[in-house]
Amino acid sequence: MLDLLNKLNDEQIKPVMDTEGAVLVIAGAGSGKTRVLTSRIAHLVEDLNVDPYNILAITFTNKAADEMKERLEKIIGDISQMWVCTIHSMCVKILRKYAERLDYKKDFSIYSETDKDKVLKRIIIGLGLESDKYLKTSKNLISSLKNKDMSTEQFARENPRMRDVTSYMKIIDEYNAELFRSNAMDFDDLLIKTYHLLAEQRDVLLALSKRFRYIHVDEFQDTNFVQYNIVKLLSYANGNLFVVGDDDQSIYGWRGADINNILDFEHDFKGAKTYKLERNYRSTKKILEFANTIIANNTLRKDKVLWTDNDEGVKPELFVANEESGEAQYTALQIKTFVQQRGYKYSDFAVLMRINALSRSYEQEFMKYGIPCKVYGGFKFFERKEIKDITAYLRILCNPLDNEAVLRVINVPKRGIGDKSIEQLVYYSEKNGLSVFDGVFDCDNLDLNAGAKAKIRGFKDIISKLIVAKETMPLLELVKEVIAKTNFMSCFEEDTPENDDKKKNVNEFLSSVEEFARLNPESPLSEYLNSITLSSDTDEINEGEFVTLATIHSVKGLEYRCVFLCGLDAEIFPMQRALEEDTEEEERRLMYVAITRARERLFFTRARSRFLYGGRRATEPSKFLTELSDKLGIVKKSEQRYEQGGYSSDRSSYGNYGGTGSHSGAGGYGSSDFGYKNSGYGGNYGSSDSDYGYSKSYGGYKNNSYATGYAVQTSKPTEKIHSSDLGKFHTGTNVRHKKFGDGVIISTKNNGGEIIADVAFKGVGIKSLVLRLAPLEVID
């Protein structure tokens, strides 16, 4: 045990040795709280001869529980009698033993979220209601009421003006009755029924609280009302409760977590002792300076200041793009530079965002530059249901023979076209050798009643008009027309956070269309669909070696060498909804969590304009950026537009599509706004592919000399394509490249006399090539 203590600092040793009574450890980010927890348990067993049977350690993820078990087994050996588990697992153990006290059988089922959905849908339909309208709110209410230990009667009394409150209460009561009849519990039942068991069955309370002489709780700031009271009851007999948490990392209020559980701990447990772990082992001094500055603006917190003996480090930087595509491209190019020139691995990087809708532009840019990435905190953008639904409509307009697309959206939004009607439609189409869409046009011949036929005919009329519109409407206007004519947004009428996210995803999809149409003004809908299909089908290049794209919530507890925190615009972070609901402090805690994920480098990014609410609009900086810049100042890196030689879009201001090269400082990243004063971005990185016609050098500078546009060596290109042969290369042409292999041209454009082709290569991604220089050949 002495060896273990030697690995702890003075701040950590004190709570480890304080074993009696209630103890609160305020553990700042990266302060070694897991080591403190395991060391304390080891001290109890090894030095104080406490039986592992009498120790309980509660975590809030299975991964954390497994890691703690592994550490403890290495230190003290057999821990089979010790309970080290999540709070839900603990409740299952208790309920299995005492199930009959609650009129359940001990082999009760535990319903998953999918099981819960099926039960609720059946009940809602049985009550003559629409499942799509009531399902999500019913689920949320069930969880909320159970975690607050509130009856439906009490909720109805307190919310008399809530729309359809009576219907919701009927659904919830019937749901709970159905679970009981089925001898089943859902996840929230595991908590609330354990709480009632302990609170109402004194002999059970005494038996369990006497057994667990020493109780440990990790991530205490994330406990809700029921969880907190379970822990409090279990400590009844001995009072030895050791909790570890950080009020500054309480970010799950929307899920029921109550920050007051940790803030009021000393009040609730008289005589409780509090220790602070403020030494950070993760981040540089500069990063911690930003973390301390941002969180100091909160009022609901215990005072603490993180410090470290780590290096001073590089001051975090802010990059301001003209629009979201530039924000993503800047990040991609920075990552490429760090990997190719500074010895970083892709797994060293995380791109963090407040909402997962922002991942779309990053997924596209990363694919383009061959950067492997994995999306957490949501599905990949083009794989999300609402996006797949919209693209299915667009696929039908381009290819009415696409049966899968027709079947996907024939009843989206709900049109009353039921399963039986669809089965009859498919049967008729197959029997007569027709596509499903042809079957839709023959709906009068289907073996259905007049009402069912009329609904299918309505779908046919919508699609027919959109097919006509496709021939004359510009791309962006056409997509907006599809959304309007299909009444697509009615899918998200219910006011829920989930629907808010889906609306934002639809808006982000429109941004993708707008960007494509602007950069490819002559390209039809089919080419746009090709571009996003390639994006959707691209998986990680090297498993385990990828950039993390994630919401901030999903990376809590993790760390990375380099973090890009994107979308720092007003209304996005902090979210407008949070400001309206007076939860700004939780948003600021989320900002703090994001900052403290970074070990060495931290970048903030935002865009001066975004495609929001159906159109492009100017944005304002996040108030969090203002709070940081007012006190610390932020090194600002701002892209600039071309003044000559090419497009004036975000993409061309990176020199992505070539150009003539300029030394005026008007392009590339511009002046000292790039941030690498000792290395030319058009140097080593660009020249490495100079023989392949790849416009990979994106302007930049070296020693205050600036370059825009195409900066690779061009004096002796290998295997040039003769100008007379350029006509062979057009959208849809299959080609072979000397380095990148086989691919297909997905778009071409004329930039200052140079023909630039975007080519999607198998296993590589999309590359922008100067056709005059690229060693390409047409293949069959």
Language-model features: locations:
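A basic/glycine-biased coupling hinge at the interface between accessory DNA-binding modules
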Residues: 2, 20-23, 28-31, 42-214, ...
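N-terminal pre-P-loop "Q-motif" helix
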Residues: 4-20, 226
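Short glycine-/polar-rich loops that comprise or flank the Walker A/P-loop
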Residues: 21, 50-54, 80-81, 116, ...
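Helicase P-loop NTPase motor core
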Residues: 25, 29-37, 270-273, 278-372, ...
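Conserved Walker B
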Residues: 29, 212-223, 227, 247-248, ...
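Conserved helicase motor core of SF1/SF2 NTP-dependent helicases
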Residues: 31, 221-297, 304-309, 427-430, ...
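Conserved helicase C-terminal RecA-like lobe
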Residues: 161, 359-371, 384, 391-634, ...
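C-terminal accessory regions
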Residues: 567-768, 773-780
